Amino acid sequence: MQALMLAAGMGKRLGNYTKNATKCMVPVNGKTLIEYAIESLIYAGIKKFTMVVGYKKDVLKNFLKGKYPQIQIDFIDNDVYDSTNNIYSLYLARDVLSSDDTILLESDLIFDKEIIREIVSSPEKNLAVVSHFENWMDGTVTVLNEEKAIKRIVSKSDFDWNKIDSYYKTVNIYKFSKEFSKNIYMPFLGAYQTAYSKNEYYETVLKVISYLDGDILKAHLVEGSRWYEIDDPADLKIASTRFSSGKEHLESMYKTFGGYWRYPAMLDFCYLVNPYFPPKALVNEMKQMSDILLESYPSGDKQQSLLAGKIFGVLPEHIAVGNGAAELIASISELSSGKVVVPFPTFNEYPNRFGNENTVWLPANEDFSYSVEDIVRSAEENSASYVLLINPDNPSGHFFTKQEVIVLAEQLSSKNVKLILDESFVDFAEPEIRFTFIDDELISKHKNVIVIKSISKSYGVPGIRLGVLVSSDESLIEKIQKNTSIWNINSFAEFFLQIFDKYKKFYGSACDKIAEERGRFSSELSKIPGVKVYESQANYLLCKLSGEAEKIGSLGLAEKLLDGYNILIKDLSSKKGFENGQFIRLAVRNCQDNDRLIFALKEIFS
């Protein structure tokens, strides 16, 4: 068994990464792609490796010279690499390919080293490594028959998104027998490039062969998480994350702040959503309108306020719509002056926007609780202009009842202090204590209250970025609207506001389910030795580690969960307010997901 790599291309889409070297010399986490590949070949017991090279070939040859004495490395030059494609590179290697059973691979891959060993040891003579199609994949896809053989290769023009469940993406790693290469593949390839062009892809020939004989090339199935194809800098970033480990892996995930659809196998307990909403009917209605929405401009702020006012039962003059609550937090901070009292630990977006120099930190006790009196006293002592209350608080889950918020608003009003009330998680409180200040009667009576609510978090639609700010101060609403762009939310977000009322009863039911599952989840977590769960009225739980769990630590636990179980949690070790212990925050997801996390925690702490 030998190996052959096609590495003549220029890798133009990688920009500066391939300015001075070929694509296979691009580093991923400190090691080049070619090093990963050769080490995988050596691990599989392969002794001979041939590379078809072209662009920056001398740089590559010098890099590999004497580096791997365990394996024979030969080179074939493709000096017309800039005007040909990989079909010609493979044709140049026809004698090598026909001389022995061969592992064929491309130069822009990073992959689990076990894959090469698996196909080398497989009894199947001719194999294509494939993964069940996922949305992030691009390139050649196949359809398999019942015997897991490739019966058809789907061209881009025939690709149908409605059939993706039946598609398998080629990883661009193959095993060809000597007989297949010599008697079937190379004769077809030679004839094809003579008849058509040298600027084609070798998969085109495989498409013809699979059409004529749907059993000759078997599929070797691997998980999509075990490989990645690197065509551009965005791919490189994703590959670096996928193939990192420990603290580097965790930090890489945190730094993206989302976009986790690129990691479909990962279970996200870090970011906070509503697992029971929206219902399929709402999603399908939005899908039905997707073409029109994609091609249409959204309305301006007055129409958005009208739609949001309808949902929340307030006058449009009392509500502003933002591109997520984050835009509204930024806007209110820009329009504010003076000090703001912030109970901590808290959601960092607020102190980041108001500025540490204007933030008065109100320390909570060891149970992360505080009283109305604590807040009022701090506001008075520091001559604050504002108080921020996230209710339930993030990340503690601490909760003020409706009466407590009313008392707080009244006492602050008497001191000419405004209350910024963030209700992003209040809908998840137990039904008997659930309430909202987004009510025209309440905000008209308590004119010093400014309510902010993240629709993205509460309604399970973070991708469309929606939030609202509510106040009876109409001049403030006008200022907020002037402070944002005329089209600050997109057509998909506007359409969600337009149709939401039809699904309002489903939303209430979804919030009840979260409250119920939170109780069960909290109870099960509390049974794990070394895990203390704090009471919460939100869609997340604050936990403190003790005993043996504390020795692992919050950071160590987050690393173990991500590397070993593909589960992402929020490590709070670097967050202000958690200096005296090991704390994590866990989102409340559905029962199945929560049980998967509980199983992982029990294994780690056993």
Positions of PLM-derived features:
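Conserved PLP-binding catalytic core of the aspartate aminotransferase-like
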Residues: 515, 525-565, 588
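Active-site pre-lysine segment of PLP-dependent enzymes
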Residues: 118-122, 369-382, 395-419, 423-461
